[in-house]
Amino acid sequence: MEASYERGRPRAARQHSRDGHDHHVRARSSSRENYRGEYRQSRSASQVRVPTVFHKKRVEPLTVPPAPKDICPTLKKGFLCDSSFCKKDHQLESLTDRELLLLIARKTCGSVEQQLNITAPKDSRLANPTADDFQQEEGPKITLLTLIKTAEHWARQDIRTIEDSKLRALLTLCAVMTRKFSKSQLSLLCETHLRREGLGQDQAEPVLEVYQRLHSDKGGSFEAALWQQWDRQSLIMFITAFLNIALQLPCESSAVVVSGLRTLVPQSDNEEASTNPGTCSWSDEGTP
């Protein structure tokens, strides 16, 4: 359509419009040069450029990335899924309007809640728990080794029917263990998480953001926001995946750092050496 319109116009007009376009591009590039010049001057004047990211004001309440969703394909096709083996996400909020309409149209009897096994809402008061919420006498001293043994134990459990206070404590365990990884390991943690859960690359951004924000969480505020804003099923999926992958990855990416720290371990305390986060990988520490 455009080509035939071009052909019908006089050559001069066509030429003029192209020239005009070129002129426009040149104008942009010259303004870019000016910008670069100004940037160089300001940089050389101060020699220090503070990253703008530190000037962002904290937004309250905290916004949490959406939980990674792996929606059941049967549900997406508009059929109710009644397989007891299906481990996919069966939440209706995850469906598009069209998929939801299909589902409603096909549904003839029975209660949706019953068939979709919708989990009970969690106790939101546990977002910022106190020590009293975890009724317990004085327990063992918490060392890194204790954390690893605890994570190994819970990685083997089915936590779908677990009580809320324990689930909340498991979220804290994940947060604490995330912070034992070096920052450079977080993208590997994210990739391994996606692979284990069979999630697409479109979920990489929210998963990575959760790990990054747990890693830099001050005072547990992001952890509390996660508990309040994610549903129980999403929390269970995330925690289960993390506990299973965290123990397989070395907690420090740099072999140089690890070998350097190894030289500092006192000879008499070799049995205790594994309480140092940098001495070896999670998996090494986990084996008796």
From Swiss-Prot:
Belongs to the filoviridae transcriptional activator VP30 family. Residues 26-40 are annotated as: RNA-binding. Keywords: Activator, Host cytoplasm, Host-virus interaction, Inhibition of host innate immune response by virus, Metal-binding, Phosphoprotein, RNA-binding, Suppressor of RNA silencing, Transcription, Viral immunoevasion, Viral nucleoprotein, Virion, Zinc, Zinc-finger. It comes from the Viruses. GO terms for molecular function: identical protein binding; single-stranded RNA binding; zinc ion binding. Changing residue 72 to S: More than 70% loss of RNA-binding. Homohexamer; hexamerization is essential for RNA binding. Interacts with the nucleoprotein/NP; this interaction plays both essential and inhibitory roles in viral RNA synthesis. Interacts with VP35. Interacts with host STAU1. Interacts (via C-terminus) with host RBBP6 isoform 1. Interacts with host DICER1; this interaction prevents TARBP2/TRBP binding to DICER1 and thus allows the virus to counteract host RNA silencing. One of its GO terms (cellular component) is host cell cytoplasm. It is found in: Virion; Host cytoplasm. Residues 30-41 have a biased composition (Basic and acidic residues). Phosphorylated by host. Phosphorylation negatively regulates the transcription activation. Phosphorylation and dephosphorylation take place in viral inclusion bodies and are largely influenced by the presence of NP. Dephosphorylated by host PPP2R5C; this dephosphorylation enhances viral transcription and is mediated by NP. Residues 100-104 are annotated as: Oligomerization. The keyword Zinc applies. One of its GO terms (biological process) is symbiont-mediated suppression of host defenses. The modification Phosphoserine is found at residue 29. Changing residue 230 to F: Complete loss of interaction with nucleoprotein/NP. This is Transcriptional activator VP30.
